[in-house]
Amino acid sequence: MPGGGPVLSAARGALAGRLETAGLVVLFGFTAMAVVGYAVFGRDPSRLAGMPAWTAAFYARSFGFFALGHVWLAMTVLGAVLAVRVGWRWLAAFVPLYLISLGSELAGTTWGIPFGAYRYSALLSPMWLDRVPVVIPMSWFFMALPSYALAARASSSAWARVGLASLILLAWDLALDPAMSYATRYWVWADTGPYYGMPWLNLFGWYVTGVVLMAVLAALRAEEWTSRISLRWWALFYGANLVMPLGMCAAAGLWGAVVATLAVLAILTVPLLRAGRLAGWSGSTGSGGQ
């Protein structure tokens, strides 16, 4: 339902703008702290020698803390911005996307389909059925939504939108998997492959899962409310979540993953830049509603 008058609408718009900015600042700040910590201490724990005892104790928990904390923080930022900008309509998308991605992950960790055989480590606990961390389907949602929102501005065709959004989502995994399963061990592959130990089947599984998620968003006409948030904010939110694995890859010297991710995104950015010039990077179609 509409906001309730121009004054209330303007106030909600101002609040949303401040919330969007603050959320990105906090998310980028947390990400920077995590990446620097990994680069300094994660790659060389001997640097902890001679430091206060609490530092070593914190380091022992930091791998789980920063990974889990980043997911919860990103979800909180996105949920807060969506609540102010669009009300609670986004929950109708969150529930099916969470359940679909959970089902896909359960199939992967049980039967090796559609990603290949792998398992999650206890670093990301708690887990559903001792197989899939609770936060993993959340991360699928908060990266699928900006991917769809960006693609929706670049194409008016539902099929093109679904295909492009799935590729934008897939680009994230080109950095995520090397960072989380090769440089570190948040999950471990039983099936292996040439791309930092990841099987090629994983990319296929990611794309197929992405297509299903984007098709659900298209069926729900999510573009009607994601368009209330500016193209620039969606791009920055996506980037804030990409910086974590990309920075970890750089710190670990996995430059192939860095180059591959940036190269794919550079190609995908062409239609997005065109959309940005036409629609205005900071423009949105509304300030609130439910």
How would you label these PLM feature ranges?
Residues 2-290:
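Aromatic-rich, lipid-facing transmembrane alpha helices and their immediate juxtamembrane interface loops
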